[in-house]
């Protein structure tokens, strides 16, 4: 994978932010360009625009997804450590190159579909660091409503929190919880690319999209309209020199993904909890946090897909 990022936080000496990033990997290609004015109209009001194009070759989902779009956003403080962001997004989604032997429920959704959506995000954040927090709390409530034009008609809600507590010097306990639900309205069902997916970095010990509703006749993951997940993690010194920025982690993850609008004898959709345990190492690199985790499932369904090793870049919440 090759990743390239440029961020100028004081464009032309006016405090404006311009960011460009591109990711080239075997399974996805991403281009993102964003501009933010932090003091729009000389007020504590941020305004921004985002442009993006994302192509994902999703072998585990039996189809490729191409997303092209743009968004506008405005953010403002509502209380100490609390900020509200309002946004609008328009994008074109193209489900393409569907495998010939893919699930009927996937093949039926092949083609282009536009999404026009308004959103809000309310964030409360008291963490001492965005990159490597040792104490504090971040909570996030997000709502997106699609149907202001476009083809998609759905309402998506997400609520999550992550709490960090130092039990002694460099020994940090973190607790994470998140849940979400999406539903269609009018005559529209929730489409496969609008659902939630669980696994990989969101539920270690399981493959990306390895948990949740599945067409067992083709072994294709279908995503779910509802999910919950949680994690308990202990971070501690690795025993190596502190200036290397390497830490050790032990954790347990749990969660579940369920509910699809499709129905049929071949769809497995259990609401049962999945649970895994594991450990890993993280490195505070100049480019951001890099982690290697090893995890194994303790509770799972027969049709779930396991994953032993997971490499990740960046923060998890």
What are these regions (language model features)?
Residues 1-138, 203-205, 209-220, 225, ...:
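Gram-negative/organellar outer-membrane beta-barrel architecture
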Residues 10-14, 39-44, 78-82, 161-171, ...:
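Secondary-structure transition/capping motifs at alpha-helix termini
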Residues 27, 64-66, 153-157, 272-273:
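Short, glycine/acidic-rich beta->alpha junctions
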Residues 89, 94-261, 265-266, 301-303, ...:
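C-terminal outer-membrane beta-barrel translocator/porin domains of Gram-negative envelope proteins
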């Amino acid at each position: 994978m090759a990743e390239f990022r440029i961020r100028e936080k004081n464009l032309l000496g006016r405090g404006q932010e311009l960011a460009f990033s591109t990711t080239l990997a075997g399974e996805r290609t991403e281009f993102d360009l964003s501009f933010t004015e932090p003091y729009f109209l000389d007020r504590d009001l941020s305004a921004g625009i985002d442009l993006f194009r994302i192509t994902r070759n999703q072998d585990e989902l039996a189809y490729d997804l191409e997303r092209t779009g743009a968004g506008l956003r405005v953010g403002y403080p509502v209380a100490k450590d609390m900020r509200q962001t309002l946004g609008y997004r328009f994008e074109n989604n193209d489900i393409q190159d569907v495998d010939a032997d893919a699930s009927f429920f996937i093949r039926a959704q092949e083609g282009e579909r536009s999404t026009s959506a308004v959103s809000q995000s309310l964030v409360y954040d008291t963490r001492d660091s965005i990159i490597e927090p040792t104490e504090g709390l971040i909570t996030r409530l997000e709502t997106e409503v699609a149907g202001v034009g476009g083809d998609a008609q759905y309402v998506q809600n997400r609520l999550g929190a992550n709490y960090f507590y130092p039990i002694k010097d460099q020994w940090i306990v973190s607790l994470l919880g998140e849940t979400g639900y999406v539903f269609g309205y009018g005559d529209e069902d929730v489409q496969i690319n609008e659902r939630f997916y669980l696994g990989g970095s969101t539920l270690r010990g399981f493959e990306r999209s390895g948990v949740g509703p599945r067409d067992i006749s083709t072994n294709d993951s279908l995503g779910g309209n509802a999910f919950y997940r949680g994690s308990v993690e202990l971070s501690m010194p690795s025993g190596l020199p502190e200036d290397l920025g390497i830490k050790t982690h032990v954790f347990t993850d749990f969660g579940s993904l369920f509910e699809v609008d499709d129905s049929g004898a071949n769809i497995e959709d259990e609401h049962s909890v999945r649970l895994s345990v594991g450990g890993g190492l993280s490195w505070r690199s100049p480019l951001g946090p890099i982690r290697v985790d090893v995890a194994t499932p303790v509770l799972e369904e027969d049709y779930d897909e396991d994953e032993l090793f997971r490499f990740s870049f960046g923060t998890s919440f």
